[in-house]
Amino acid sequence: MPLAFCGTENHSAAYRVDQGVLNNGCFVDALNVVPHVFLLFITFPILFIGWGSQSSKVHIHHSTWLHFPGHNLRWILTFILLFVLVCEIAEGILSDGVTESRHLHLYMPAGMAFMAAITSVVYYHNIETSNFPKLLIALLIYWTLAFITKTIKFVKFYDHAIGFSQLRFCLTGLLVILYGMLLLVEVNVIRVRRYVFFKTPREVKPPEDLQDLGVRFLQPFVNLLSKGTYWWMNAFIKTAHKKPIDLRAIGKLPIAMRALTNYQRLCLAFDAQARKDTQSQQGARAIWRALCHAFGRRLVLSSTFRILADLLGFAGPLCIFGIVDHLGKENHVFQPKTQFLGVYFVSSQEFLGNAYVLAVLLFLALLLQRTFLQASYYVAIETGINLRGAIQTKIYNKIMHLSTSNLSMGEMTAGQICNLVAIDTNQLMWFFFLCPNLWAMPVQIIVGVILLYYILGVSALIGAAVIILLAPVQYFVATKLSQAQRSTLEYSNERLKQTNEMLRGIKLLKLYAWENIFCSRVEKTRRKEMTSLRAFAVYTSISIFMNTAIPIAAVLITFVGHVSFFKESDFSPSVAFASLSLFHILVTPLFLLSSVVRSTVKALVSVQKLSEFLSSAEIREEQCAPREPAPQGQAGKYQAVPLKVVNRKRPAREEVRDLLGPLQRLTPSTDGDADNFCVQIIGGFFTWTPDGIPTLSNITIRIPRGQLTMIVGQVGCGKSSLLLATLGEMQKVSGAVFWNSSLPDSEGEDPSNPERETAADSDARSRGPVAYASQKPWLLNATVEENITFESPFNKQRYKMVIEACSLQPDIDILPHGDQTQIGERGINLSGGQRQRISVARALYQHTNVVFLDDPFSALDVHLSDHLMQAGILELLRDDKRTVVLVTHKLQYLPHADWIIAMKDGTIQREGTLKDFQRSECQLFEHWKTLMNRQDQELEKETVMERKAPEPSQGLPRAMSSRDGLLLDEDEEEEEAAESEEDDNLSSVLHQRAKIPWRACTKYLSSAGILLLSLLVFSQLLKHMVLVAIDYWLAKWTDSALVLSPAARNCSLSQECALDQSVYAMVFTVLCSLGIALCLVTSVTVEWTGLKVAKRLHRSLLNRIILAPMRFFETTPLGSILNRFSSDCNTIDQHIPSTLECLSRSTLLCVSALAVISYVTPVFLVALLPLAVVCYFIQKYFRVASRDLQQLDDTTQLPLLSHFAETVEGLTTIRAFRYEARFQQKLLEYTDSNNIASLFLTAANRWLEVRMEYIGACVVLIAAATSISNSLHRELSAGLVGLGLTYALMVSNYLNWMVRNLADMEIQLGAVKRIHTLLKTEAESYEGLLAPSLIPKNWPDQGKIQIQNLSVRYDSSLKPVLKHVNALISPGQKIGICGRTGSGKSSFSLAFFRMVDMFEGRIIIDGIDIAKLPLHTLRSRLSIILQDPVLFSGTIRFNLDPEKKCSDSTLWEALEIAQLKLVVKALPGGLDAIITEGGENFSQGQRQLFCLARAFVRKTSIFIMDEATASIDMATENILQKVVMTAFADRTVVTIAHRVHTILSADLVMVLKRGAILEFDKPEKLLSQKDSVFASFVRADK
C-alpha cells in the first residue's frame, strides 16, 4: 500500500489550504516536526564532535559533575513526555489503521518528537556533567519552538470541535503543558546560573565529595535515570569481574552518608527532643522521636515509592483482563462516524480496548513499577544503614563514658554491649527497611479487594475473607516462630559460651582428661538447642506451607463458589486469570504481615535496651588541685568536658555518706610545697557496685611527684582497685581525689583549659593522660609496633630503648614479620610474658608524666623482671623525673622505691619511705626483709650483665613457629618464616575469590541421607507439576465456560451443562487439594533435611575438634574455630534450609513459567534465546561482585565489632591515656568502611533486580504480543492466552529471586566447606597399646619417673625443644626445674602428658611406658597446675570437681590448702557460689589459688606445678610451698620455678638450657659451686 505523509487520497481534506494553511491538519503536523529537526541538527554535531572525541572524554570526569537547578524535575518531565509521545505514536497508528488510506503525519511527528526528547536529555546530561551551561541555549530555543507549535496544534483542534472524546486532543493538551513546564525549567536555570543575558554568570563548583576521587559511591550524584537503573554500577560490576573487590575499590563514603554526619544529625534530634521533654531525655519514646526526626524524611520518600509501586502492580491483572477479554470476544471493526481534518481520531475507550496497546502499557507499567519498588528498597536500606552507623557511634561514645562498675560487676556486660551493637542496631536497620510496608500493605489490600469485587462480584469476598481470616493464623505462626527463634538464640548463646570456654581452656581439659565432660556439656545444650530448632523448623514449614497453600485455597473456594452459587455470572478466562493475579497480589502483604510485626516487636525491644544502656551511669571526673588559670591558647589536647554521674538510689552508700559528712568538702593538704604531689586522696571510700559495701575504705594517701611509688600487699587487699580508684574508674562513696593540675599532661601537651568548666563542676577539671599497664595485659588487634606506639608518633630511638628495656627484641626477631606481625584475639598468638611486656612497653613508650604499672612482673621470670626494673622503670621513667606508681609482689625491689604504700584488707596500712617503715613498722619491715634479703649492687650489676649475654630466645609460644631451638641455625630462618606465615592466619587476610565448588552442596545434601534427599527432589518436582496442572485446567475450564454460556451453549438439557461444570469443578478441586498436600510435604521435607544436616555436622565438628592435637589449637586462631561453631553453624541451622527452599521454588517456578509460555506460543522460544544469554551474563557478573561484596561486608563488620570488644575490654586503659577521641575516630573509620560495603552490596542487589525485572517485563511483552497474534489468527484460545500472560508475570516476579538465592546459596555453602575443612583435622591417638585390664587401677601409686634419652618436638616439621634428656626421679621426691625463658621447662612438663611429639626416647612411670597408655588414662592419673589460671563459669564445686567424684570435705580440705577456705565461706552459697566467665569476680591471684585447689582435689601421686605461683604475693607463696611440702610429702612433685627461691627446699634441682639438662643435683651442692648456673639464678632472685 503506498505511503504518503498527508495520506494517499487526493481529495483528502489534508491537502486543502483554501481556508488557510493553519487550518490544514497535515501542515500543522509538518510544522510540529520543525523544532525536533532543529534540535537534532544542532545537538548531534556537538555530541559527536565535542563529547565524542577521546580527548574530550579524558576531561569529563565525575569530579566535574553537578546538578543544574530543576535537575530531578527535568528528568521526571522528560520521562512523562516520552510516555505521552509513545501514547501519541500508538494513537496515530490506531487512527491511521481505521481508514484505508495511510497518513504518516498522524504518528511521524510524534516519532520525531520522541527522538528529540531522548536527544535533549542526553545532550543535557553531557552539558551538566561537564559544567558548561552556555550550550543549554539550544534547549531553550527548542522548548520554546516546541511549545509554540504544539500550542498552535492544540488551538486548531479546539477550533475544529475536536474535544476530550478524542484521545489526540487530550494528548496534545498534555504535550503543551509538558513543553511549557520544560521551558520554565530552562528559564529557571538561566535565572539561577546567569550563563546568558547576564553580565556576571554564577560559578558553581561540583560537590565536595566529587572533588575527592576516592569517593566511588556515586548514587547521590548521578542523574535520575542512572539512580533508578543503577547504571553507574555497570563499570563497577564489570571491574569486579576482572579483579577482586577490596576497600580501595569501593573507596570512601560521601560526606552526607558518613557515620559522623549521621551521628551529628541524630544528636541534634536528641537535643531537640530534650528541649521538648526534659523528663525522659533517653527514654524509649524520646529515642523513637529522635530517630523519626533525624531519618523520617527519607522514610516518607521510601514509603511514597512503595505505594506508587504497589498501585502500579495492579496494572498487570487489569491489563490481563483487558487483553483476554478483547481476544475472547468477536473482533469489531470500528466504523468511523466523524472525521476531523480529513482523518479519524480514536477515542480513549477504543485506544484502551486494543490488545496490543494494553500489552505495551503493561510493559511500561511493569518497568515503572519495578523501578519504584527497587527505589523504595534502596532508600529504606540506605536510611537503615545510615541510622545504624549513627546509633553505633552514639553507643560507642556512651561506652567511653560508661561507669566501670557497670562492666565489671554491674548490670552491663561486654557481651550485652556487643549484642547491642551487632544485633539491636541491625534490628533497627531492618525495621526501617520493612517500615514502608506498615502503610503500604493496607493500601494494597483495600485496592485489591475493590478490584476483585469489581471483576468477580460478591464471590470475590469469599476468597478475600479466606485470606483475611487466615491472617491471624499467620500471625500466630509468626509469633511462635519468633518465640522459637528467641529460644534457639538463647540456647545457641549458651552453647557458644560453653564452646568458647572449652576452647579457651582446651589445654587444661586435655591435661586433666576432661574433654568428654565438657564435650557432653556442650552436647547437652546442643540437644536443647535442637529441640528449639525443631520447633523453629515446624513453624517455618507451616509458614512456608501457608504462603504457598493460601493462594490455592482462596482461588479454589472463590472459583468453585463463583460457579456454584452464581451460575449466571461471568466466568470467562479474563475474569479467572485477572482474579488469579489479584489473589497473588493480595496474599503478598498478608505474608509480609508476620515479618513486619516480628520486626516491629524486635525494634521496640531493641530501642528499650538502647534506652536502658544510654541511661546507665557514667564516670566522674576527679578534682584537680587549684592553680592559676592557663592562658587561653594552651588548652590540653586531651581535655574533656566533666561528666556527671546519673543519680541512682544507693541506700548503702548514703549511709556511709551520713557517717562521713565532714569529708565531703575537702581540699588537698597544703603541707609543704603545693606542687610536690601528683595525686592525693583524702578520706576516700570506693566501691564497684552502686549499692555495695565499699571495697576501699578510709583511703588517705599522697603520691609524690616525679618519684617511684610502690603499692604492696597480699592477694585481694585492693592494690589494683586503688589504682583504678585513682583513675576515677570506681564509684566514689565519699572523700576526694585531687590531681595536681600544675603537672603538664605530657610532652607537648598543655594543661587543661579552665574555660571548659561548668558552673556545677567548677573544681572538677580533668586530669592529664596517664600511661597505664593493667595487670591483665590488654592488646589491640594490630601489629606489635602499633601496640607499643599506641597511636603516638613513631620515634625510632625511643622505640629501640623501650624494646631493649622490655627484652622484646629476641621475641620480635623470631616473629614471622618482626614487629609488623599482626597480633590479635587478645594476643593469643603470644605467651603471657610477652603480652605483659608489650603492655608495659606501651606505657614506657608514651610521653606522659604519670605512669601506672599494675603488677608488671607477674608473668615474667627473674631475669626479665630485673632487666625491666633496671632498664625500664628506673632508667627510662624514674631517672626522667616521671611519676611512677608500681603495684608489685616482688618485694626485692622495695629499696628502689621513693615512696611505699602498704595495703591490707582494702585499707591503707601505712605509707612512707622504706626507712619510715623500718622505724615505725618494725614487724612488717622484718617480714619484708626476710623475703627480699638482697645482695650488694656489684653482684646485681654482674647478674644484669650476665642476662645481657646473647642467647637465642624461645619466648614465642608454640603457636608462631618452632618455638624452642628455632633459630640455632641462621640458614633455616627463611624456612621458619615461611612456615610461620603459613600457620599464622592473622598475619595476612588472603582474599578467597575462587568460586565455591558445588561439591559443598553435594556434601550438604548427602549428609541428609539418600531417602530424605530423594523425597525432597521428588516432592518438589511433583508439586510444581501439579501447580501447572491446576492453572492449565483452569484455562480449559474457563474456555469451556465461554462455550457453555447461556448465549452460546445451545444445550438441550440444562442438567447436561451443569454436569459439565461440576466435572470441571471437581477435577479442579482434586488438583488444588493435591497441590496443597504437596506444599505441606515439600515444606516439611526441606526443614527436616536442614535439621538432620545441622545435627550431623555439628556433632561431627565438635567430636573432631575436641580430639584434635594441641598443635592445632596453637596454630589456628581461636576466633576462626569459634566462628565455625557460631556463624557457620547458625548458617547451616537456620539460613541454608530457607535459602534452599526459596532457590528450588523460584527456579522451578521460572522453569515452569517459561515452559508454559513456550507451550502456549512456541515462537516465544526464538525470543527466549537472546533473553537467556543476557540473563546468564547478568547473573554471572552479579554473582562474582555479590560474593566479593558480601565477604567485604562481613570482613569490615568484624573489625568494627572487634573494636567495640577491644574498647570495652581496654576501656580503663583508653581513658587513662585520654585516647577517647582517637578511638572514636577509629570507630568512625570502621563504621564507614562497613557502611560503604553494605551500600555497595545494596546497590549491587538493586542493579541485579532492576535488570532481571526489566528482562521479566520483556518476557511479558513478548509473550503478550505473540499470544495476541496467535489468538487473532484463531490459533489460540483466550484461556491459554490468560495462562501464558499469568505465567509471564510470574517470571518477572521470580527471576531476580532465583539469581539472588543462587548467589546467597553460593555464599552460604562456604560454611559447609569451611566445616568440612576442619573435619579433615587429624585427631590425637587416644588408643593405647595396653589393654585397660593390664593397667593397675591405682597406677601410679609410687610416683617413680624414669626419663630415658627423651627428645621432644611440637611438630614433625619443627626442631626439637628437648634433646636427649635422661633423669631418674624417685618416689616422693620434690624436683625443682629452672632455666631461662625458652629453655624447655614447660615442654618438659607437657611431655608427661604426651601433649608434644615424643619422637625419641621414653618416659616410664611406675614401670609403665606412658607411650603405651591410652591418653585418657594417662592424663587422668596425673595432675598439673598451669601458669595461666583457667576458671569456668559455674559453681566453685564444678570448677574444683567437674567429675563429681569428691565429697564436700575433700573440697573444703583442698580450699584450705590453697588458702581459700575463708574466702569461699564468706561467699553466699559456699561451694555453690557462682564463678563468672573467666573468673572475673576474683582477682588474678585468687584465680590461681583456685587452680591450685583443683589440682589438690585430684590427689594423684605425681604433681606438676608450671610457674603456678606467678600471680601470688611472696608471703602467700611461701605458705603454699610449706603446705605443698607437708600435704604432698609422700608424692612426687615437679615444680617449674617462677621464683628460684621457691625450689631451694627441693630434693633435686634441674637446670635446663636450650632443651638439654645443664645441671641436675641437690640444691645445696649446686649452691656450693661458684660457677653453677643455678647459683647465679639464686643470687639474681634475692
Curated annotation (Swiss-Prot):
GO terms, biological process: action potential; cellular response to nutrient levels; female pregnancy; glutamate secretion, neurotransmission; intracellular glucose homeostasis; memory; negative regulation of angiogenesis; negative regulation of blood-brain barrier permeability
Binding site for ATP: W688, G716, S720, S721, S1483
DNA-binding keyword on record: no
Extracellular compartment spans: 1-30, 90-106, 154-169, 320-356, 455-460, 558-576, 1032-1067, 1162, 1266-1281
GO terms assigned for molecular function: ABC-type transporter activity; ADP binding; ATP binding; ATP hydrolysis activity; ATPase-coupled monoatomic cation transmembrane transporter activity; ATPase-coupled transmembrane transporter activity; metal ion binding; potassium channel activity
Basic and acidic residues biased stretches: 753-766, 939-950
Disulfide bonds: C6-C26
Cellular component, GO annotation: inward rectifying potassium channel; membrane; plasma membrane; presynaptic membrane; protein-containing complex; sarcolemma; synaptic vesicle membrane
Topology relative to the membrane: Multi-pass membrane protein
Record keywords: ATP-binding, Cell membrane, Disulfide bond, Glycoprotein, Magnesium, Membrane, Metal-binding, Nucleotide-binding, Receptor, Repeat, Transmembrane, Transmembrane helix, Transport
Record: residues binding ADP: T1381, G1382, G1384, K1385, S1386, S1387
Boundaries of every ABC transmembrane type-1 domain copy: 299-602, 1013-1307
Transmembrane segments: 31-47, 73-89, 107-123, 137-153, 170-186, 304-319, 357-372, 439-454, 461-473, 542-557, 577-592, 1014-1031, 1068-1084, 1144-1161, 1163-1175, 1250-1265, 1282-1297
Region of interest: Disordered: 741-768, 939-962
Regulation: KATP channels are regulated by cytoplasmic ATP/ADP ratios; ATP inhibits the channel by closing the pore, while ADP activates the channel. Activated by phosphatidylinositol 4,5-biphosphate (PtdIns(4,5)P2).
Main location: membrane
Glycosylation sites (chain numbering): N10, N1050
Localization in the cell: Cell membrane
Cytoplasmic topological segments: 48-72, 124-136, 187-303, 373-438, 474-541, 593-1013, 1085-1143, 1176-1249, 1298-1582
Entry binding sites for Mg(2+): S720, Q775
Function of the molecule: Regulator subunit of pancreatic ATP-sensitive potassium channel (KATP), playing a major role in the regulation of insulin release. In pancreatic cells, it forms KATP channels with KCNJ11; KCNJ11 forms the channel pore while ABCC8 is required for activation and regulation.
Family indicated by similarity: Belongs to the ABC transporter superfamily. ABCC family. Conjugate transporter (TC 3.A.1.208) subfamily.
Subunit structure: Forms an heterooctamer with KCNJ11; four ABCC8/SUR1 molecules interact with one KCNJ11 homotetramer.
PANTHER family assigned to the protein according to its UniProt record, in alphabetical order: ATP-BINDING CASSETTE SUB-FAMILY C (PTHR24223), ATP-BINDING CASSETTE SUB-FAMILY C MEMBER 8 (PTHR24223:SF187)
The protein's name in its UniProt record: ATP-binding cassette sub-family C member 8
Source organism of this protein record: Rattus norvegicus (Rat)
